[in-house]
């Protein structure tokens, strides 16, 4: 599994996986490029700054603001924190579709897989190392059709789910070729969502004009006067805006959001354009459960 065979009708022979990969690997000095250009998140120094902390009351207030339920905290978040995996449950769901529900629904609930995909045993990055990876590379992608050393100047992150310390390191990184901008996805409660998204585009365009190539979309700052654009909507909107303006490969998008707390939430955010996610409220909820 995960290996290739090439039937070369010109040479009249079958080229195996090893020979095929060696041929392509030798076309450029990729190893030298990576050694000189690749930056590892794990190698960055932790800045002398503190990660924001919340009291129990503040945490509960934010949980209400982002729509956390008691069951999500006690079953989904707690189970993932204790076991490092999603809880096992029966296939299927008997809850009403979000579009038919009369109750307020998270935007994540409107997105479903087209089919039930099940493998036995489960496929993951541990059991299937040869064909899967959780590593992500953050930064300007450059010309995908041109092989050059500058394209290797990216930040390597071993897991797309960032700790608060990971994000702190990225936010304060001082490495040539990387410029980080933080953009708020909150807006005043008396304003409209449409205006908030338009202003989000203005901030993104300004950051790119100033040479930024890593954007941190953050919804910290939610309070009685400010609400957050749904993280999935903000991610998708910025992604599509950059595609329309033909600048998508110039920047990477990282989320600092209190909204996601289930595997499905993270999957949709990554699928709709996020490179990495810092679920700060889920992390804070775990701390509160421990305390």
Give residue ranges: language-model regions.
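Glycine-rich phosphate/ribose-binding loops and adjacent secondary-structure elements
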Residues: 6, 178-291
């Amino acid at each position: 599994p995960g290996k290739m065979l090439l039937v070369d009708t010109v040479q009249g022979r079958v080229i195996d996986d090893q020979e095929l990969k060696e041929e392509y690997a030798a076309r450029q000095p990729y190893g030298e490029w990576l050694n000189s250009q690749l930056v590892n998140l794990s190698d960055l120094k932790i800045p002398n700054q503190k990660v924001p902390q919340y009291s129990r009351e503040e945490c509960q207030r934010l949980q209400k603001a982002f729509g956390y339920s008691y069951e999500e905290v006690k079953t989904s978040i707690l189970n993932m924190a204790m076991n490092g995996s999603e809880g096992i449950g029966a296939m299927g769901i008997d809850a009403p579709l979000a579009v038919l529900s009369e109750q307020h629904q998270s935007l994540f609930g409107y997105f479903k897989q087209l089919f039930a995909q099940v493998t036995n045993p489960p496929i993951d990055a541990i059991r299937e190392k040869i064909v899967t990876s959780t590593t992500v590379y953050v930064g300007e992608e450059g010309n995908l059709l041109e092989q050059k050393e500058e394209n290797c100047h990216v930040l390597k992150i071993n897991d797309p789910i960032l700790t608060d310390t990971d994000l702190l390191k990225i936010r304060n990184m001082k490495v040539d070729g990387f410029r980080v901008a933080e953009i708020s996805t909150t807006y005043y409660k008396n304003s409209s969502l449409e205006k908030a998204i338009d202003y989000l585009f203005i901030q993104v365009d300004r950051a790119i004009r100033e040479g930024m190539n890593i954007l941190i979309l953050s919804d910290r700052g939610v309070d009685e006067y400010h609400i957050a654009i749904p993280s999935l909507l903000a991610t998708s909107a910025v992604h599509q805006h950059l595609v329309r303006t033909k600048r998508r490969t110039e920047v990477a998008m990282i989320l600092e959001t209190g909204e996601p707390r289930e595997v499905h939430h993270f999957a949709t955010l990554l699928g709709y354009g996020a490179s990495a996610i810092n679920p700060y409220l889920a992390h804070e909820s775990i701390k509160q459960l421990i305390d």
